[in-house]
Amino acid sequence: MIKQPIPDLSPFYYWENFNYVLGYVKKQYQNLLSDSEITFIQDFENLPKESQCLYLRLASRRALWFREEKLTYVEISNISLSLDELGEKGFIRFASTQDSINLGSILSVFSKKECVALASKLAHFPKYSSNISKYDLVDLCKPFGIEILQEMNKIS
């Protein structure tokens, strides 16, 4: 059997594919779309291309929270600007002290070492064993949600 060469993909292949499907849905199923779905499509199409790309990249990842410094996509020249545009248009939101209820999922994007560093900044944080698991450390952090999030905002 002769192996076929793998075609070179455009750096924006996922964006091109998404827009192809989106165009098809708009053409074939416009009458089935809700007002909120139509608004989403219009708002998405009004975003700059790089912001659309970043949104698609984030939407295809498993996690709910992401650290900006961990986002690297060669086809997106200014991730910070794209994040700001996505935030301004309501496509994403940034962690705030109001997210203390979600602290466990937010801390999941940090390493155990980073969680220890955040916890160590709190004077009244309880003592814990050095061999504590990250999961247990995150549980210890939950009652200090707002303070932990404030510390996170200082380092981000």
Cite the ranges covered by each PLM segment.
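Basic helix-extension-helix modules of the SAP/HeH family
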Residues: 2-45, 53, 57-156
